[in-house]
Amino acid sequence: VQPPFESRSYVELTLATLRQFGVQASWQDELTLHIPGGQQYQPALAAVEGDFSQLAFFAVLGALGAGPQGVRLTGVNPQSAQGDRQVIEIIRQMGGRIVEEPEGYLVQRAAMQAGQIDLADCPDLGPVLAVLAAHAQGESRLYNAGRLRIKESDRIADVQAELQRCGVQMHSTAEEMFITGGGPYAAFEPCQAHNDHRIVMALAVLAAVGCAPLRIDGAEAVQKSYPNFFEDLQNLGVKVEIAND
């Protein structure tokens, strides 16, 4: 692997799946992976884990006050190798109230404080953690974020454009985002999806907590990863209207 080795957690998750089906691999050093040839996959019973990258939107909703008793998140493995599992610890470090339960977590409202957030192994969390930072007291720094520029959109530039449209104080460099918490927020023109499912969902979270109603053009981008996102949002009591124009 050529350095810098970012998103290592995705490699570890793949290796865990290989082992589950009988294929062995081992690290010789931090950057060298050895996979012996001639191995055969073996059948196995496998349970598909819940996705922490999608859970993150509802974890942030719970931390910022959605749901009268908080938001209960089930169907995930707290010991998962998924890098996006870091969202739980990030919210805790910023002051969030999270109770681990047998099948997941209960996330409850808390006063959030600014944080220093390393996105090297969890870049997909960038958009929704930017929304969390917009509601935290002080200036948050999201760093090792350069991979966000080569996702479905330039997630640094486009998240900045949309959050600033809503009144969020944010600036960025090639690899970092700096966000000063505040609110309430409002946009006086439609927000844009940039054909990016995670930007749509992050903006929906922003709209649901501490923001005037938002119109998000191109919201159908959620079909890529979470077609039922808006239905699940409605189940938490968030008002969602689908515009046909």
Q: Which residue stretches match the model-derived regions?
A:
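Short, structured segments at the rim of ligand-binding sites
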Residues: V1-D245
